[in-house]
Amino acid sequence: MDESSGDGDLGNEGHGGEGPAPSHSHTVQASDSPITVPGWDEYFLGIATAVSARAKCMRRRVGAVLVHEHRIIATGYNGAAPGRPDCLEGACPRGRLGYAEVPAFSDYDVPGTPGFCIAIHAEVNALLFATRDTAGCTAYVTDQPCPGCRKALAAAGVVRAVWPGGQFDVDELVDWSR
């Protein structure tokens, strides 16, 4: 099921029971003051933002949340492999460079190059630590997934990726013209 058009609040009639749950925030009149309720996409992107606060990268802090039928099955953030020194501890060659020193269009996945990055991306960490099958999930990410993460998400059966300002459906995840 698409997280943006579910059946309400996990089985109860939290949105009034009339039609699909909204994917964008809406205002509900409660007593004397209106309450703004975020849509599912906004809600899970907000959680991904909170997850990104755990990232150990000096350059980019990215969070990801894998969701199946409005239930979180995994979270992940970018950083070194568990138990390994991370960027904040000075272990990342890319993290030791100033922004002007990072080679333009460098391959951050090639060890020994000046732009090499030790981080495992947030999406991959979420996939690695998922507690359930990821087929049919939506990935909520704080930044557009890179090509490698798009491939990993598609291979894991993720059917949709959402980030602030954009989204890919199952076919777009592996459409390299995008």
Please annotate each region the language model reported:
Residues 1-178:
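Zinc-dependent deaminase catalytic domain
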